Amino acid sequence: MRLLMRFMKPYRRLVAVTLLVLLIDNVGTLLVPTMLANMVNTGITTGDVDYILRNGLYMLIATGMASGGAVLGCYLAARLAANVACDIRNAVYDKSLELSASDFERFGTGSMITRSLNDINVIQQAILQTIQLVLPVPFLAVAGIIFAWLIDPAMGMLLGVVVAIVLVAAVFTVANAAPIFMRLQSFIDRMNVVLRENIVGVRVIRAFNKERREEQRLDEVFSDYAANAIKVNHLFVGLDSSTFFLMNIAEVAVLWVGGNRVGAHAMQIASISAVLEYALLILFFVMMAQMVVLTLPRAAACLNRAQQVLEIKPSIVDGQRTLDAAASDSKDGADAVAVFDHMSFRFDDADEDTLCDLSFACRRGQTTAIVGSTGSGKSTVAKLLLRFHDATRGAIRLDGVDLRELSQGEIRGRIAYVPQKAWLFSGTVASNLRFGNEDATEADMLHALQVAQSTFVLDQPQGLDTPVAQGGTNFSGGQRQRLAIARALMKRADLYIFDDSFSALDFKTDAALRHALQDETRDAAVLIIAQRISTILHADQIVVLKDGEVVGLGTHGELMETCEVYRAIAESQMKGGE
């Protein structure tokens, strides 16, 4: 609730106006039955036409208040709910960008999607329905009973008893429903995770002929959700039937007691209809409020899940230092852009170091390559440079400053990164290239495409405006890699990181691309993480990793003579035709 108040605080004025409009709506609604009873009892019974016309005008005004207030109140409530939900969603998204990789893994991709979309939609609907259907209940109940009491005290007491019984039933139902709704939300999380895995991995599932197995897995998850949803529906059905039953009982009781009161000349016959309208109005709103309140535990769970994201303290905190612009502008070929100084790293849940005592430098104007077997920690080096994780021991320095003393934004502003899995965003080729430089001209983009050997784009009828599907699935693996490289080249960076970014290229394209990169990145440091020895033959220095440790450092020629691990990798690839 504290989180909700925080996000509603900027809309205090809108909240006040919305409540005022709803109050006008409710007052108008409550006045009409009494006015109608007075018109019948006084005007029609006595034949007083002036009274009828005057009271009819008042009824018209009250009806206008109720109708206008209902329409305007609905609009204002919807606007308030949408604004608050939008702010919460933006806050959750912004917070997710601050989380480190290990922080993000605590929630999981499927859960974060659910929290950002489904959960906040539930919160939005809860805010809207609470304003429209729950908040008016106390006022309508008290005012309705008072109006009925003014008509006839006995009828007012009867109405008070009926409302109390319905409210007790509602509280009992809601108390039993809360745990079920909490479980329902966890089942939605599970469904999202399993569905996402099946959609993303559909080709693997088909390749291994595991459709039946995944169908069973999905069926289990769906069955669990369905069983819980059926329990919820049983509650709603029971609530519906019991509420309608009580409404009918209340109607019979009002007519029976009212008939006796009329027979005893204690009240007039038209007053029965007014009391009956108050009873039905109050019970209707109580019934609707019950429906809404039943969903509030789920909304509270969703709000709590959003709060979990917003209140998590990121394990990686921005430092306060800034890089020296003069140092970063230096073009000295010996200038070390990034330095690993006896750096070791261990994942939070690991028993041993993933990387151990790494010491080497990436220098401006030089190419540093990292090679090693699968699982040796090559890609982790790139993630550490981007500060997706922090070093456990030792230090990594960028232009002489420890990464932990810098902001993540400043670090990543100096680095251009091509990930191991080339990912393109839905849109066009041009919109993807502008991820690297929003102000890029067409000439800049064409130059980057040429360097990245991506001129195939120009052969397309739409050129730079060629559509790109989500993930770039309308391009081949090699084309995606080259477009990702072109996107990185759009960014004039101090350090370019290519994480196995040439693996899908044929040898001719690989060689042409690396040759073009030499001129394009001559004023920057280049770090290439590769599996193929042919990709890094001409690197200025090659770092050989085995089980997270540096077992070789030098040029290709030096390592062939001094490093057994490197020589074994090179010879195995040569025998394999590489």
Q: Where are the language model's segments positioned?
A:
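ABC-type nucleotide-binding domain
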Residues: 326-578
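Cytosolic ends of transmembrane helices, especially the final helix of ABC transmembrane type-1 domains
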Residues: 187, 191, 200, 206, ...
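Juxtamembrane loop-to-helix connectors within ABC transporter transmembrane domains
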Residues: 97-141
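Transmembrane helices of ABC transporter permease
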Residues: 10, 14-25, 129-184, 256-267
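Membrane-integrated ABC transporters
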Residues: 1-32, 36, 44-59, 73-77, ...
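Loop segments that connect adjacent transmembrane helices in multi-pass transporters
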Residues: 110, 183-231
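Helix-loop junctions and hydrophobic alpha-helical segments within the transmembrane domains
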Residues: 92, 96, 205, 306, ...
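Hydrophobic alpha-helical segments in the permease module
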Residues: 59-70, 163-167, 236-252, 256-257, ...
